[in-house]
Design a protein with these regions (language model features):
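Conserved beta3 VAIK motif of the Hanks protein kinase fold
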Residues: 97
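Basic, Lys/Arg-enriched alpha-helical interface segments
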Residues: 1-81, 90-94
Length: 100
């Protein structure tokens, strides 16, 4: 099964998800997502679609504010859990950084 490649950008009618990119156009977030097994990658991309649709209205158990407007998106398959950090910006943008 081939993993979906969003080219560092996922856009819905409601919110736009933007992956952090380095100056050399590499995308550590995409590299991380590409390293996941197919099942977990599908779950994370599915949760990103839900996040893009509901934005700041999405709550636990799917998202959680950690501190100072930094959130985590949670994806779980079986006993495996993946957490992706993100924050909101004006203009209905969700930024997924390389690291915080």
């Amino acid at each position: 099964m081939q993993k979906e490649t969003p080219n560092a950008l996922r856009k819905h009618d409601n919110f736009e998800i933007i992956f952090f990119e380095l100056d050399n156009d590499s995308c550590p977030v995409q590299d991380f997502l590409d390293s996941l097994n197919d099942k977990m990658a599908a779950k994370v991309y599915g949760m990103m679609d839900v996040l893009a649709e509901f934005g700041n209205e999405l709550r636990e158990p799917y998202t959680k504010e950690l501190e100072d407007e930094i959130y985590e998106l949670r994806a779980k398959t079986g006993t495996d859990i993946c957490r992706v950090l993100f924050f909101f910006r004006s203009g209905k943008k969700i930024i997924i950084p390389m690291d915080l």
